[in-house]
Swiss-Prot record:
GO terms for biological process: DNA recombination; DNA repair; SOS response. Its main location: cytoplasm. Keywords: ATP-binding, Cytoplasm, DNA damage, DNA recombination, DNA repair, DNA-binding, Nucleotide-binding, SOS response. GO terms for molecular function: ATP binding; ATP-dependent DNA damage sensor activity; single-stranded DNA binding. The gene is recA. GO terms for cellular component: cytosol. Pfam families: RecA. Belongs to the RecA family. SUPFAM superfamilies: P-loop containing nucleoside triphosphate hydrolases (SSF52540). This is Protein RecA. It is found in: Cytoplasm.
């Protein structure tokens, strides 16, 4: 109801809730490559958890894994974005205190 009140055409809105960051980026890539959409919004990049982190043990070190995943994805997506003229918006969060999930 809120989105409709803001003018969003709900009937043409595609919504995805991927299981991993890689899956979300793959979905975004396929949508962009198809040329069927004008806008792709990823909210939030911070919630894109790499598959290795999901499948790994809680004590495993995953330093830089998300950054590498996003860097690789952006290299792949940028050519498709340029070719199809799709707008891609990636929303992220800034955190002042590491480990705090919500707020500062």
């Amino acid at each position: 109801a809120y989105a409709r009140a803001l003018g969003v055409n709900i009937d043409e809105l595609l919504l995805s809730q991927p299981d991993s960051g890689e899956q979300g980026l793959e979905i975004a890539g396929k949508l962009i490559d198809s040329g069927a959409v004008d806008l792709v919004v990823v909210d939030s990049v911070a919630a894109f958890v790499p598959r290795a982190e999901i499948d790994g043990d809680s004590g495993d070190s995953h330093v830089g894994l998300q950054a590498r995943m996003m860097s690789q994805a952006m290299r792949k997506l940028s050519a498709s974005i340029n070719k199809t003229k799709t707008i891609a918006i990636f929303i992220n969060q800034l955190r002042e205190k590491v480990g705090i999930m919500f707020g500062n």
